Amino acid sequence: MVDATDPNTGNMMAGYVQGIVGQALQSGTQSSPIVQTHLLFNPQMKSAYNFVPGVMGLILMLICAMMTSISIVREKETGTMEVLLVSPIRPIFIILAKAVPYLVLSCVNLATILLLSVYVLHVPVEGSLWTLSFLSLLLIAVALSLGLLISCVVQNQVAAMIVSGMGLMMPVMLLSGMIFPIESMPAVLQWISNIIPARWYIQAVKKVMIEGLGMAAVWHEALILSGMAALLIGLSLKKFKERLE
């Protein structure tokens, strides 16, 4: 039986098995067995089963991080951020007010992707929607805090767009397992991929959405995403307070 969650890896593994069996048959030391290959989770080898979780991770990361950083930097460029900061409103509530619209937008995007995957691409959601939503909220929290951290470092919208857009798009696409299996990467790239939040999200979403597993199977990925979110939120708030001082 072959795990076909990733069609490319599934084909490769099936080919290896057939090659080993073929060598055993050529040796002539054993009777010819009947080889039956069973593809688990994705018997039709649809590529959509692989790229739908990847697209979810890519969109959530880019929209939250890029739009949040650009929005806050725009306020700094126009001078309205300073006006807001000298008001009686606490800075944390100002940041939350900027982040909430993109949180809602990301939830809408998540629902849209799931509807398209189920009704257009015919990729079922085998696991719990609550678990999938919880994992998505963790990634959104990571992306929002990363966008806030970027806005504290850069000085203008162009720089924010370059750092949050190009700086996140390529690592997410190449090092998260969205396109290339992580197991086939060089050891250095595998190590670097550990700090890519989308890697853990995509890995967990495949288990829940395609394999139908529950929270007990993705607690490791959820714990890593929670740690990343807490770390980035702490760094971004600290950096934001330093800029205020």
Across the structure, where does each feature detected by a protein language model lie?
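Residue-level hotspots within pore-lining transmembrane alpha-helices
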Residues: 21, 57-61, 69, 73, ...
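Transmembrane alpha-helix boundary and packing residues in multipass membrane permease domains
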Residues: 66-70, 114, 118, 148, ...
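Short cytosolic juxtamembrane segments of multi-pass membrane proteins
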Residues: 238-245
